[in-house]
Amino acid sequence: MGTIDISYYNLFVGLLLLAIPFFYLWKFKTGLLKPAVIGTLRMIIQLFFIGIYLKYLFLWNNPWINFLWVIVMIFVAGQTALVRTGLKRRILLIPITVGFLCSVILVGLYFIGIVLQLDNIFSAQYFIPIFGILMGNMLSSNVIALNTYYSGLKREQQLYRYLLGNGATRQEAQAPFIKQAIIKSFSPLIANIAVMGLVALPGTMIGQILGGSSPNVSIKYQMMIMVITFTASMLSLMITISLASRRSFDAYGKLLEVSKEAKK
């Protein structure tokens, strides 16, 4: 039995559930009602367009087009990270783009080529969803970690300079701030991994079961999805911080103005 389709009418009926959270956003004057409505409308429009695009992407199944789509995702993720972190373009754009590109290619192709052992590693059926999952998780973890890293450096400038003054290298002086960034970014992911299957069934597993896969196959895919997202997120963060830090300090190790707001 395949996945049951949802008619457009039934989809509309399902969307009516949003009236509940929208009501409480309005009742308590949170200021989030307008962003929530706009965000929902954007989600609907974007997903419909992506659905149309992916239909032809899967139909063509062209390696060059598939890879171009990944490049587009990386570009959009880089721009999104710039907005969410508030860091200057010259500080973050190249480092996070390189971090995303290297991580998604290394980890994604390792999974598709070595673990799944597909004859065509650029098959749209696997290439696009796997790389999309990796990009989404890398973006979230990088934004949280970079915000924590740079806010910590700004807040604890005296500690950073104290470490440098006592003979620490730049890498050693930056290590406590990188540590805090990793803890803040990856603690939720690690907690989620620990209770997976007990507290909640993950989306990938549910999707595969609804699509007709056996639970045994689904759990193995879910295990690997968690492994590759964890690995790719950590690798991309380390690459991004390493490259961004080289642009964030002067010759004497002093933190430069890295935020866009600093220009005001």
Segments from the language model and where they lie:
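C-terminal ends of transmembrane helices
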Residues: 21-34, 77-88
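Hydrophobic alpha-helical transmembrane segments of polytopic membrane proteins
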Residues: 216-245
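Transmembrane alpha-helices
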Residues: 173-199
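Short cytoplasmic-facing helical segments at TM-TM junctions of multi-pass membrane proteins
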Residues: 148-181
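Loop-to-helix entry region at the N-terminal start of transmembrane alpha-helices
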Residues: 6, 10-13, 65, 91-145
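Loop-to-helix transition at the N-terminal end of transmembrane alpha-helices
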Residues: 31-53, 58-70
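Structural signature of hydrophobic alpha-helical transmembrane segments
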Residues: 4-17, 60-75
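Non-cytoplasmic
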Residues: 191-216, 220, 236
